[in-house]
């Protein structure tokens, strides 16, 4: 299969620019911004791993066997972590001081299970494996990665609706838009694996967060550069 990596390259450019701008500006040092920063960095690592994985897979050379297995496994690990990170981000908008470990235990269990499957995959070959003649081959449990992403997005949707009054109309609408954008990327790639849209949808979602909820300029006065009342009411 020939993969179209144009969207992945665009996603990498978008995410790097977001990270550069976010780190270069004065910002509120709260839990939500910390999770956003982690989310953005994880997104960059995810896209980078997918680019390398698809490069080695597409090369088809026997010398790239180990590199293809390693980069693809790392990419799958990031894919397992990203949906849970989105849940954590939403929770910080509800509990902006501290995340309860007990509250996060239940949504973390599917993620831990999926990470275990990814780490054991070189031995079980349930998610993917490499064949000398066919190259990259999807395993019998391959679609579990997509089901996990969709399931976490469904859980995120429920949390957003339940906590909409606490978070406010603006944040609620932004989060719902992000679910639509990111979810569309997952669905498109699920229907056509050659279109690598998951990373692109992720980058657009993080961009939407950056220019709205996590915009550093929102919390500072344009003349003095000090925090304004919006920072104090976060």
Task: Name each model-derived stretch.
Residues 2-10, 117-155, 189-195:
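Extracellular-loop-to-transmembrane junctions of the mid-late helices
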Residues 6-86, 107-125, 175-190:
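Hydrophobic alpha-helical transmembrane segments of multi-pass membrane proteins
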Residues 17-22, 85-89, 146-167:
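Alpha-helical transmembrane segments in multipass membrane proteins, preferentially the mid-helix core
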Residues 22-36, 91-104, 161-172:
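Membrane-interface helix-boundary motifs at transmembrane edges
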Residues 63-73, 131-142, 198-202:
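Non-cytosolic membrane-interface motifs at loop->transmembrane helix junctions
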Residues 89, 101-111, 131-138, 150-162, ...:
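Alpha-helical transmembrane segments of integral membrane proteins
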Residues 162-217:
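Interfacial "cap-and-anchor" motif at the non-cytosolic start of specific transmembrane alpha-helices
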Residues 214-234:
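Conserved nucleotide-binding and Mg2+-coordinating catalytic segments in signaling enzymes
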């Amino acid at each position: 299969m020939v993969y179209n990596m144009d969207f992945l390259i665009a996603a990498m450019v978008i995410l790097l620019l977001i990270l550069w701008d976010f780190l270069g500006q004065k910002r509120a040092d709260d839990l939500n911004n910390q999770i956003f920063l982690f989310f953005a960095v994880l997104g960059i690592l995810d896209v980078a791993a997918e680019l390398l994985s698809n490069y080695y897979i597409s090369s088809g050379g026997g010398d790239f066997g180990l590199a293809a297995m390693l980069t693809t496994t790392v990419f799958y690990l990031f894919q397992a972590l990203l949906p849970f990170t989105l849940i954590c981000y939403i929770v910080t908008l509800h509990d902006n001081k501290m995340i309860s470990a007990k509250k996060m235990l239940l949504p973390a269990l599917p993620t831990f299970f999926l990470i275990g499957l990814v780490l054991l995959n070189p031995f079980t070959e349930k998610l993917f494996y490499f064949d000398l003649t066919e190259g990259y081959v999807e395993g019998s449990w391959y679609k579990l990665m997509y089901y996990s992403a969709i399931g976490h997005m469904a859980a995120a949707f429920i949390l957003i609706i339940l906590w909409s009054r606490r978070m406010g109309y603006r944040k609620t609408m932004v989060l719902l838009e992000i679910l639509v954008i990111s979810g569309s990327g997952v669905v498109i790639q699920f229907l056509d694996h050659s279109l690598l849209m998951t990373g692109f949808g992720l980058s657009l979602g993080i961009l939407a967060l950056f220019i709205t909820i996590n915009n550093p300029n929102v919390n500072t006065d344009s003349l003095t550069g000090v925090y304004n009342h919006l920072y104090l009411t976060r």
